[in-house]
């Protein structure tokens, strides 16, 4: 439209001539470059899936990572069995820690991060991410306290575990165990959608959730059923 042509591509241009010209008005070229690379309002987060619970969280993290790999995305997995980038094992020690989770998030090749969080690490270091797309809470043992850190009762334990649901994005999902009363209480803390799962086909929590047009997963002996409202 302007009959212009590209005469040079400079990998390291000097912006000083535009910001402080010898004559004329300064131009905000730095801001324009940043806006071009990172448009205002755009979402640059990769999907993060956080899993916590007193037991069962490692196989759940591994299963989620496996299914994601089947979709041909590069998965970063940080769990108690090790640190994995794609199909490669980087470490074979317990990496369900803040440091390992952060390492996963800093890997530029990772397209989806699956992070297992143990309760002690959550207490001492917190979560390695500020928000996540999916937060999974499997179970809570109210007797699993940490007296060395002045955590004595179930309310304090609840406050630790709830952080996994506190950080779920409004566009995300909190996946909660309908068979654990303490976990059920976390539903109201989730900014996003809540999906309950249960092994009890007669679960009152599931029934109420479905009546409110929610989604739920029922785990049977030979099948897994996803229900949405009154649909199955």
Residues of each region from the PLM?
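Short, well-ordered alpha-helices that flank and scaffold nucleotide-derived cofactor binding pockets
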Residues: 35, 66-70, 106, 188
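Flexible active-site lid/hinge loop adjacent to a nucleotide/diphosphate
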Residues: 89-210, 230-232
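A short, flexible beta-alpha/helix-coil linker loop
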Residues: 12-16, 82-85, 141-145
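General structural feature for long, well-ordered alpha-helical segments within catalytic domains
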Residues: 25, 29, 33, 47, ...
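Walker A (P-loop) phosphate-binding motif
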Residues: 40-86
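Conserved beta-strand scaffold positions in the cores of enzyme catalytic domains, especially
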Residues: 48, 75-77, 135, 194-196, ...
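ATP-dependent carboxylate activation and anion-phosphoryl transfer catalytic cores
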Residues: 1-52
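Short polybasic amphipathic segments
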Residues: 81-89, 215-230
């Amino acid at each position: 439209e302007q009959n212009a042509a590209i005469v040079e591509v400079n990998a390291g241009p000097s912006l000083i001539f535009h910001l402080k010209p010898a004559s004329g008005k300064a131009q905000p070229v730095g801001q324009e470059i940043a806006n071009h690379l990172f448009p205002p309002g755009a979402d640059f987060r990769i999907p993060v899936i956080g899993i916590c619970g007193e037991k069962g969280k490692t196989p759940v993290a591994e299963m989620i990572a496996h299914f994601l790999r089947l979709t041909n995305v590069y998965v970063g997995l940080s769990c108690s069995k090790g640190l994995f980038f794609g199909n490669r094992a980087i470490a074979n020690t317990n990496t369900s820690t803040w440091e390992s989770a952060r390492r996963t998030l800093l890997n530029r090749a990772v397209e989806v991060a699956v992070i297992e969080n143990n309760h002690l690490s959550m207490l001492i270091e917190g979560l390695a991410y500020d928000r996540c797309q999916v937060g999974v809470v499997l179970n809570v043992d109210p007797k699993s306290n940490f007296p060395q850190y002045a955590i004595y009762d179930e309310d304090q334990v609840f406050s630790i575990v709830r952080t996994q649901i506190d950080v779920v994005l409004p566009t995300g999902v909190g996946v909660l165990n309908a068979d654990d009363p303490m976990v059920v209480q976390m539903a109201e803390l989730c900014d996003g959608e809540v999906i309950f799962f249960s092994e009890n086909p007669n679960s009152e929590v599931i029934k109420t959730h479905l009546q409110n047009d929610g989604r739920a997963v029922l785990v049977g002996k030979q099948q897994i059923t996803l229900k949405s409202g009154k649909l199955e």
